[in-house]
Amino acid sequence: GRDAYIADSENCTYT
């Protein structure tokens, strides 16, 4: 959940 454009396995963040 670090980058808004990468679907992080721990926290998918799409801002």
Curated annotation (Swiss-Prot):
Distribution of this protein across tissues and organs: Expressed by the venom gland.
Compartments in which it is found: Secreted
UniProt KW Secreted keyword: yes
Annotated InterPro entries: LCN-type_CS_alpha_beta_dom
Keywords: Disulfide bond, Ion channel impairing toxin, Neurotoxin, Secreted, Toxin, Voltage-gated sodium channel impairing toxin
Main location group: secreted
Modifications the protein undergoes after translation, according to the UniProt entry: Contains 4 disulfide bonds.
Domain of life: Eukaryota
Annotated family: Belongs to the long (4 C-C) scorpion toxin superfamily. Sodium channel inhibitor family.
Task performed by this protein: Inhibits tetrodotoxin-sensitive voltage-gated sodium channels (TTX-S Nav) in rat dorsal root ganglion (DRG) neurons in a concentration- and voltage-dependent manner. Lowers the activation threshold and produces negative shifting of TTX-S sodium current activation curve. Induces shifting of the steady-state inactivation curve to the left, delays the recovery of TTX-S I(Na) from inactivation.
Name of the protein: Toxin BmKNJX11
